[in-house]
Amino acid sequence: MAVRGINKVILVGRLGKDPEVRYIPNGGAVANLQVATSESWRDKQTGEIREQTEWHRVVLFGKLAEVAGEYLRKGAQVYIEGQLRTRSWEDNGITRYVTEILVKTTGTMQMLGRAAGTQTQPEEAQQFSGQPQPESQPEPKKGGAKTKGRERKAAQPEPRQPSEPAYDFDDDIPF
């Protein structure tokens, strides 16, 4: 089997504004996101830390678009997996181009961390994909410290007590 090429983009960044969701004539949802990614380095000549931010246009389709519109807000950190697409159009006789990351039903969007002003714990990241996700099984621990031929059990952290009462949201989840 010959592979003609791979078009895959992975981004981890923050939303610059709330998602813009619209519905196309067939009823499908489309969401536009503006995602900022930053990298920093130390300038070799001056020794000061430099930072460069890139802005990416991300387009989500279907259920992912609906979920993004409902749960993502400006400042939210997201993991995006999609493919690059450049399209063009005519604007008053001038050809315009835009490059976007498309996240179709085979792509992935995962909410990471928490945005400013939210109460979500960082370990409560949620992943959304256009494909059904298998139920995750806890991975068995590998290795570990041994004492005189016996495996030493790690101290189990005490469960955290929630500051607010726990609610059952299973019925309200749209996927």
Curated annotation (Swiss-Prot):
Q: Which residues form the SSB domain?
A: 6-110
Which ranges of the sequence are annotated as binding DNA? 55-61
- Keywords of this entry: DNA damage, DNA recombination, DNA repair, DNA replication, DNA-binding, Plasmid
Question: Residue ranges of region Disordered?
Answer: 113-175
Q: Which Gene3D superfamilies match?
A: Nucleic acid-binding proteins (2.40.50.140)
The task this protein performs is described as: May contribute to the conjugative processing of DNA. It has a functional relationship with Psi (plasmid-mediated sos inhibition) proteins.
What protein is this chain from? Plasmid-derived single-stranded DNA-binding protein
According to the entry, what is the taxonomic lineage of the organism? Bacteria, Pseudomonadati, Pseudomonadota, Gammaproteobacteria, Enterobacterales
From the UniProt record, report the name of the gene that encodes this protein. Answer: ssb
